[in-house]
């Protein structure tokens, strides 16, 4: 477990949080390789969440692009509609092991809030979800589902009323309640041990994808593409391929209305080093070094920073990062829906858009895997404003 990735990561937190982080680190080290814990997690991932997910050859999309073979890792088929359940199940089982009776979470697109509400119901843990008021408005369906599972949803009215503000509130809660509460951070962000732990729970994506592509093609892919907000779905699929230097790894950030505007969420492409939410990483900042307002059509990609491992992988040039605009993401949303009968989440549509773009430039015997991190049901209301029939 990495305390830091190069200079990124660490624990930049108030003293009062150190005991809970130490307790969590100790518990995670104890259980992560414990056969009983692993068996229980595997049981729930398979029987409850629906793993393993298919690696689907998108034949129609491949033909339409006229280049590389495109495979989709179908995390959108999991219970709750996204990859988030992989991590929520792992952390909830850990919370139970250390005697916590309450769980809290932050959420942007509502997917992580939903998966946390689900595991709260499953394991009899009281759940409270913090969500920016702006996101509550644009993700009504997920908010309703969370409440249906018995979770309390708190609409955060401070700051930009989006994900970063929800994290601030959740951290405040945890400072006061950590004796009986576990904070299930939803992305590979935050103070150590969260980035390593979330990556480990999400790495099941890459482990499966590697096995599946070897079965399907007898070799590794040429490129893997995944969207990056905080960066958990991407680190989950990249992790298993980090050592395979011949595999190009591409993280796709939200370019919003354009990288030359101030309305985007591209923390790696346009951010600077800074400290927020307990970690040193790359963040979008204004001229005074304050955290800048972010923007993306997709609620899950408007975090103003990125997980510390991504900042490091960018620095050592192991992962290439690209930006996709709202317009390009909407086009990919529509294209995948029409050509394959699969409606992707707006977050995942950013990865699909970039995958489509590079597939055209590649040879027909080359292979791309796109991580389809979630499905688009939650985004239909947003998309209706842009795509009309």
Swiss-Prot record:
GO cellular component, one term: cytoplasm
Pfam families listed in its UniProt record: PALP
Residues recorded as bearing N6-(pyridoxal phosphate)lysine in the entry: 84
Reaction catalysis annotation: (1S,2R)-1-C-(indol-3-yl)glycerol 3-phosphate + L-serine = D-glyceraldehyde 3-phosphate + L-tryptophan + H2O
Keyword entries, A-Z: Amino-acid biosynthesis, Aromatic amino acid biosynthesis, Lyase, Pyridoxal phosphate, Tryptophan biosynthesis
SUPFAM superfamilies: Tryptophan synthase beta subunit-like PLP-dependent enzymes
Record keyword Oxidoreductase present: no
Classification via InterPro entries: Trp_synth_beta (IPR006654), Trp_synth_beta/beta-like (IPR023026), TrpB-like_PALP (IPR001926), TrpB-like_PALP_sf (IPR036052)
UniProt keyword Plastid present: no
Pathway annotation from the record: Amino-acid biosynthesis; L-tryptophan biosynthesis; L-tryptophan from chorismate: step 5/5
Cofactor(s) this protein cannot do without: pyridoxal 5'-phosphate
Role according to the record: The beta subunit is responsible for the synthesis of L-tryptophan from indole and L-serine.
Family note: Belongs to the TrpB family.
Record note on quaternary structure: Tetramer of two alpha and two beta chains.
Protein name as it appears in the record: Tryptophan synthase beta chain
Organism: Methanococcus aeolicus (strain ATCC BAA-1280 / DSM 17508 / OCM 812 / Nankai-3)
